[in-house]
């Protein structure tokens, strides 16, 4: 048993680089390199030293943009503040956009917002940002808020000739993004079950619990997360970061 958990710990520590080519059916002024993250779960289990290694991984890619699909903070915000993790996030060299996850609501999301205001992370909570006048980035509030806006509300008035990227932490109801004309959605939350055999159960709970997916013109990636919840081990799953090469249709 000890050997299994030791092996699971080594699997967790080995962060997997996932290359992902996304070809959009819309013109893009130039290709963009994006690093996609989810489920950092910063706190007592994952501290500043580990976060620093992740920041180095991100910066080594020299991305144009970094997207974080929720669960930046795990439970208690206290260790995040005490260890000065905001300063570490500020070492990311590219612009960073993020949405909230369900863990941001544990103990009160207001404290998480306050922490993120100390960082360069631009939190999109039922709001839209324009990046380099090339594309839109929508960040949905988490399902933990039953009053969150619909995608039809969030996309109202957008120029549909531009690509629309969506950050939505929990990958439920993927048809909503397709119906709203989203071009690419990044989600997390599932950890793909984290350990065997829970991954087999999680695979049956979601239309896509991990990896690339497509519905019509809408493309998706559900990340198993770079971090972890609970113990630092994985069995049958991987801790990952996604390196997205985003390109557009020739105009």
PLM-predicted stretches and their roles:
Residues 1-11:
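Internal/C-terminal transmembrane anchor helices
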Residues 14-16:
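Juxtamembrane/interface segments at transmembrane-helix termini
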Residues 18, 23-251:
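Soluble catalytic domains of enzymes that build or remodel membrane lipids, polysaccharides, and related
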């Amino acid at each position: 048993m000890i050997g299994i958990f030791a092996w699971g710990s080594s699997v967790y520590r080995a962060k997997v680089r996932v290359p992902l080519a996304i070809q959009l059916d819309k013109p893009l002024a130039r290709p963009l390199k994006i690093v996609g993250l989810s489920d950092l779960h910063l706190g007592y289990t994952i501290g500043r030293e580990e976060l620093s290694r992740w920041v180095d991984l991100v910066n080594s890619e020299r991305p144009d943009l970094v997207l974080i699909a929720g669960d930046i903070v795990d439970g208690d915000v206290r260790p995040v503040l005490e260890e000065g993790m905001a300063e570490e996030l500020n070492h990311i060299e590219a612009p960073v956009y993020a949405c909230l996850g369900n863990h941001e609501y544990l103990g009160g999301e207001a404290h998480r917002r306050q922490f993120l205001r100390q960082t360069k992370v631009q939190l999109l909570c039922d709001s839209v940002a324009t990046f380099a006048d090339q594309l839109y980035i929508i960040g949905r509030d988490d399902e933990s808020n039953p009053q969150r806006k619909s995608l039809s509300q969030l996309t109202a008035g957008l120029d549909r000739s531009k690509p629309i990227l969506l950050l939505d932490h929990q990958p439920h109801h993927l048809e909503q993004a397709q119906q709203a004309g989203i071009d690419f959605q990044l989600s997390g939350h599932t950890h793909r079950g984290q350990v065997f055999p829970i991954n087999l159960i999680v695979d049956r709970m979601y239309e896509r619990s991990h990896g690339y997916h497509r519905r019509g013109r809408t493309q998706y990636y559900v990340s198993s997360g770079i971090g972890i919840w609970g113990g630092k081990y994985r069995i049958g799953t991987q801790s990952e970061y996604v390196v997205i090469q985003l390109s557009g249709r020739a105009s």
